[in-house]
């Protein structure tokens, strides 16, 4: 049994977890900063860094105590080194390297995006070849995995990410940050009375685009305000969310038709969206040889448990880093050969 302690601090969650064999979560301590950033309508990097410094030791102690694990029982330290905010990443990275040095443990560098996908193993084992739809505030990508720990981006957003669009529409409607959950709840109370565009629906690729949709929503609201018309926010939320989900489902369907896979993973913060989960479940019914594995709801957001899961992939392939490991804020998926 391999026990890995993992550190995550790429954005506005400070988290430390202990994961066994890549799929058993012994502890997952998370300190969120949502309340601190809500009044700004988004993450303020300097504020995030200060909070990480305040919380890193506390979540570390909590993770160890909750798991009832002594440092000597650990096999390695996994840490997110990118992508993310450089100041935030540095706090987790320094914490992880300090812990590793103090206890003589090897350091495993982990791509934050790979962590989101690896969290599907907390649901059930991913079978390969597999495909993942990675949807978050900063990323919207279709990723093909011919084998474990190997990633090939076959489709990506050309402008805004899906989660970014939710937050921008949320700000337009004066909703609290982050707006995804609130819009999802509103969408269940509204009707799709507004026809918003689904970009690139007929293009022969797997890419996404959400900037046109965002602009259409902004224009709709501005025109209504100019005419002093009352906007039914629930109907707008329903219409907007339908357009986002339609785009995600359409590209996913095209990809599944052209890349037969055994597992399909839904990962990232937007993976918590109820409509997206429901419609992907229905879509996968048309692909009986492909098992749908959504990341469990409690692991869709940023957390260290998912970093431990991805860290286990690297551990098995002897992918370790020296203590001079640095952050890579712009890190994307890498094609890793075994």
UniProtKB/Swiss-Prot annotation:
Short name of any one Pfam family annotated for the protein: TsaD
Cofactors: Fe(2+)
Residues annotated as binding substrate: 134-138, 167, 180, 184, 273
GO biological process, alphabetically ordered: tRNA threonylcarbamoyladenosine modification
Cofactor note as given: Binds 1 Fe(2+) ion per subunit.
Keyword annotations: Acyltransferase, Cytoplasm, Iron, Metal-binding, Transferase, tRNA processing
Enzyme Commission number(s): 2.3.1.234
Bilayer-crossing regions: none
Secretion signal, residue range per the UniProt entry: none
Binding site for Fe cation: 112, 116, 302
Catalytic activity: L-threonylcarbamoyladenylate + adenosine(37) in tRNA = N(6)-L-threonylcarbamoyladenosine(37) in tRNA + AMP + H(+)
PROSITE patterns membership: GLYCOPROTEASE (PS01016)
Compartments, record wording: Cytoplasm
Class in the EC hierarchy, top level: transferase
Tagged with keyword 4Fe-4S: no
CDD domains on file: ASKHA_NBD_TsaD_bac
One cellular component (GO) term of this entry: cytoplasm
Function: Required for the formation of a threonylcarbamoyl group on adenosine at position 37 (t(6)A37) in tRNAs that read codons beginning with adenine. Is involved in the transfer of the threonylcarbamoyl moiety of threonylcarbamoyl-AMP (TC-AMP) to the N6 group of A37, together with TsaE and TsaB. TsaD likely plays a direct catalytic role in this reaction.
Family: Belongs to the KAE1 / TsaD family.
Cited NCBIfam families: gcp_kae1 (TIGR00329), T6A_TsaD_YgjD (TIGR03723)
HAMAP family the UniProt entry points to: TsaD (MF_01445)
Protein name per its UniProtKB record: tRNA N6-adenosine threonylcarbamoyltransferase
Source organism of this protein record: Leuconostoc mesenteroides subsp. mesenteroides (strain ATCC 8293 / DSM 20343 / BCRC 11652 / CCM 1803 / JCM 6124 / NCDO 523 / NBRC 100496 / NCIMB 8023 / NCTC 12954 / NRRL B-1118 / 37Y)
Gene name of the record: tsaD
């Amino acid at each position: 049994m391999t026990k890995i302690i993992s550190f995550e601090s790429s954005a506005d969650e400070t988290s430390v977890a202990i994961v066994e064999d890549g799929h058993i979560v012994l502890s997952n301590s998370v300190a969120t900063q949502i309340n601190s950033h809500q009044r700004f309508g988004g993450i303020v990097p300097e504020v995030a860094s200060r909070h990480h410094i305040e919380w890193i030791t506390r979540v570390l102690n909590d993770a160890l105590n909750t798991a009832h694990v002594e440092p000597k029982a650990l096999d390695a330290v996994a840490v997110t080194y990118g992508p993310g905010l450089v100041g935030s990443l540095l706090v987790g990275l320094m914490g992880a390297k300090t812990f590793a040095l103090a206890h003589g443990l090897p350091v495993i560098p982990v791509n934050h995006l790979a962590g989101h996908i690896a969290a599907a193993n907390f649901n059930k084992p991913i079978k390969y070849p597999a495909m993942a739809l990675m949807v978050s505030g900063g990323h919207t990508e279709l990723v093909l995995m011919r084998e474990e720990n190997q990633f090939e981006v076959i489709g990506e957003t050309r402008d805004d990410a899906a989660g970014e669009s939710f937050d921008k529409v949320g700000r337009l409607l004066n909703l609290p940050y982050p707006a995804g959950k609130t819009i999802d709840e509103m969408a269940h109370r509204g009707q799709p009375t507004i026809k918003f565009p689904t970009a690139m629906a007929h293009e022969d690729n797997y890419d996404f685009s959400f900037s046109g949709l965002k602009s259409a929503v902004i224009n709709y609201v501005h025109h209504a305000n100019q005419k002093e018309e009352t906007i039914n926010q629930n109907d707008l939320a329903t219409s907007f969310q339908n357009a986002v989900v339609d785009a995600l489902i359409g590209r996913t369907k095209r990809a599944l038709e052209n890349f037969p896979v055994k597992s399909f993973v839904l990962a990232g913060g937007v993976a918590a969206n109820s409509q997206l989960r429901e419609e992907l479940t229905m879509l996968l019914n048309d692909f009986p040889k492909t098992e749908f594995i959504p990341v469990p709801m409690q692991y869709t957001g940023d957390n260290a448990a998912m970093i431990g899961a991805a860290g286990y992939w690297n551990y098995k392939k002897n992918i370790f880093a020296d203590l001079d490991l640095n952050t890579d804020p712009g890190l994307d998926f890498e094609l890793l050969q075994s």
